[in-house]
Amino acid sequence: MNETIEPLNPIAFQLGPIAVHWYGIIIGLGALLGLWLAVREGERRGLHKDTFVDLVLFAIPIAILCARAYYVIFQWGYYSEHPDQIIQIWNGGLAIHGGLIGAVLTGIIYAKVKGLSFWKLADIAAPSILLGQAIGRWGNFMNQEAHGEAVSRAFLENLHLPDFIINQMYIDGQYYQPTFLYESLWSFTGVVVLLLLRKANLKRGELFLIYVIWYSMGRYFIEGLRTDSLMLTENLRIAQVISIVLILCAAALIAYRRFKGREIKRYQEM
C-alpha cells in the first residue's frame, strides 16, 4: 500500500518574488548561536567582544564560498551541464570540509593582521564551529538531503524518533536513514565534550585539534551510511579520505607540539 506523506515545505516565507528557505535560516541561526558562544568565551579569555564579530564578518561569506566551490568541483560533471545552478546554494550543496578550509584560512590571516594568536582564536571558536555544524544539519533535514540508505518505517520507529522526522525521511515513496540526525547528535555531544575540556587546561591549540579529531571520527563512520556522498573514485568517498587525513594530521600535531620541547602556553593563559 502506497503512503501519501507530504514533506515539510523547504520555503519558510516569501518576500515578494524572493523565496526564503529554511536551509538558509537554519544555517544562519547556527552561525549566530556559534558567534554568541565565541564572543562570550572570548571576553572571558581577555578578548574584546568585537574580535569574533569582526572575524565572522569575513569568515562566514568566505566559508560559504569555499564550501560551495568544494562541492561544485567534485560534482563538476553535473554543474558543467547546469552552470545556472552553481549559485543556487539555497537548494543545498555546501560541503563542510570546504567551509572549514575557508574558515581556517580566514582565521590565520585575521590573526596575523590583528597580532593575535591563531591557536587561541581557534580554541575559543572550536565549540562554536561544532555548534553551528550541529544546527546546520537540520537545514539538510528540511531539504530532505544528506540521508542514508533506504530503510523501513519500522526501522525508524524503533529508533523512537518523533513522527515529524520519520515523515520527512519519506522521500519518493521510500523511507531513508536520518544520517543528518546522527551527525547532528554527534556534533552536539562534541560541543559538550569541548566545553568540559576547556577546564582541563590543555596546551593552546589542542582544543581545536581535538575538535578536528572528534568531528572527523564521526564524519568518517556516518559518511559510510550516506547515499549522496561526493566520490573520489567509484568506491572511495572524499569525506572519508579527508576525515582520515585530518585525524592523522591533528593527532600528529598534538604529539609534535607536546614533545618538541618548546614551551607552549596553556588554554587558560591570557
From Swiss-Prot:
Annotated pathway: Protein modification; lipoprotein biosynthesis (diacylglyceryl transfer)
UniProt key word Transferase: yes
Gene this protein is translated from: lgt
EC number(s) reported in the record: 2.5.1.145
GO cellular component, one term: plasma membrane
Residue ranges of the TM segments: 18-38, 55-75, 89-109, 115-135, 177-197, 205-225, 236-256
GO MF annotation list: phosphatidylglycerol-prolipoprotein diacylglyceryl transferase activity
Protein name: Phosphatidylglycerol--prolipoprotein diacylglyceryl transferase
Localisation: Cell membrane
Membrane topology summary: Multi-pass membrane protein
Keyword Transmembrane annotated: yes
GO BP annotation list: lipoprotein biosynthetic process
Source organism (scientific name): Bacillus licheniformis (strain ATCC 14580 / DSM 13 / JCM 2505 / CCUG 7422 / NBRC 12200 / NCIMB 9375 / NCTC 10341 / NRRL NRS-1264 / Gibson 46)
Keywords, alphabetical: Cell membrane, Membrane, Transferase, Transmembrane, Transmembrane helix
UniProt signal peptide: none
Broad class of enzyme this protein falls into: transferase
Function comment: Catalyzes the transfer of the diacylglyceryl group from phosphatidylglycerol to the sulfhydryl group of the N-terminal cysteine of a prolipoprotein, the first step in the formation of mature lipoproteins.
Pfam families: LGT
Binding site for a 1,2-diacyl-sn-glycero-3-phospho-(1'-sn-glycerol): R137
